[in-house]
Amino acid sequence: LSSLSTSDHSQLEELLDDLNEWAPKEHVSLSLPSLRMDNFSQSLIEKTTKVRKSGLTFAAEAGTQRLRDVINKNVTWDEIEKTCSLAFANGYTSVKLYFMMGLPTETMEDIEGIAETAQKVVDLFYSNPKHAKGRGVQVTISCACFVPKPHTPFEFVPMDTAETLQAKQKHLLESVRSRKIKVNYHDSTTS
């Protein structure tokens, strides 16, 4: 399913019930991108695991609580931990965390926070004794470049230059120390 926020669909669970009847016959797996952590549930995950598991994508938005508060995204580490724990407990070994880069007031510490958040998710996976020697985890960081949009609180905030975004992308790559973490980011010049 593809949307800006899949878990906001008012009848998502009913839709998944219908797709779960159809998908196995067609050898199709279900992937739910752009999930909000505040409405991800055991019921929802059970409906996605009836067919071959693919990855789950969660919007973490920013690498630090300070920056999430600046952009008014009410995602906390506790929600990230709860959501990823639920995914791992239900057999998922791959999660993608979506972040924005170039947000207003962003510092290099916020960029390092992206890598630290991903590492904490890797550590969370291995904190379960069942996963200690089993199959590995893959945490993908996906960073989009912040582009100010009209009619939003940040519409008049200048966008970071391509050079600044490239420096932040390089710093993020240097901050990631684990082979269990993959980093994808948008081309700063086309953003």
Language-model features: locations:
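Auxiliary Fe-S-binding modules of radical SAM enzymes
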Residues: 88, 111-191
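Conserved SAM/AdoMet-binding glycine-rich loop
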Residues: 1-96, 101-140
